[in-house]
Amino acid sequence: MDIHAIVKQLPHRYPFLLVDKVIELERNTRIKAIKNVTCNEPYFMGHFPGRPVMPGVLILEALAQAAGLLAFDAMGKVPDENNLYYLVGIDGARFKRPVEPGDQLILAITIDRVRGGIWKFKGLASVGDEVACEAELMCTMRSVGEPDRS
């Protein structure tokens, strides 16, 4: 899936679109995507001057965006202005290596389970053979204007 297909599936845009390409997609099971991290990322200006590091929350967001692509594919749906896919929880997030300009972040997501409209994913972000981040992510789809039931 190239960037043109990705922007049809995700509502995010620059500077918050954090998936550049999908390289593997196995329906109802897993996805592998890429985020090319460049020195032009706006967050590097302040995180950190002289030693730029991708913020961990943005690595988690990149994983969540890849999870959204997998979920929409599994449901056979194309998102529209009436439905949004929300990140609703993160468990066990661990950061094991910094992600720096020039790195290619590989985002690997597998579906763990779907129950009561909540999707649970296992996510792994890596650079080469090194794990940068791992986490369990929970997401759900809501219609715009639908009340929060939490």
Curated annotation (Swiss-Prot):
Q: Where is the active site?
A: H47
Give the function comment from the record. Involved in unsaturated fatty acids biosynthesis. Catalyzes the dehydration of short chain beta-hydroxyacyl-ACPs and long chain saturated and unsaturated beta-hydroxyacyl-ACPs.
Does Oxidoreductase appear among the keywords?
no
Please give the name of this protein: 3-hydroxyacyl-[acyl-carrier-protein] dehydratase FabZ
Provide the E.C. number(s) assigned to this enzyme.
Answer: 4.2.1.59
Protein family? Belongs to the thioester dehydratase family. FabZ subfamily.
Q: What is its main location?
A: cytoplasm
Q: Per UniProt, which keywords does this protein have?
A: Cytoplasm, Lipid A biosynthesis, Lipid biosynthesis, Lipid metabolism, Lyase
Which reaction is this enzyme known to catalyze? a (3R)-hydroxyacyl-[ACP] = a (2E)-enoyl-[ACP] + H2O
Superkingdom of origin organism = Bacteria
* Biological process per Gene Ontology, one example term: lipid A biosynthetic process
Q: Pfam families from the entry?
A: FabA
InterPro entries linked: FabA_FabZ, FabZ, HotDog_dom_sf
Top EC class, one word: lyase
Single GO term (MF):
(3R)-hydroxyacyl-[acyl-carrier-protein] dehydratase activity
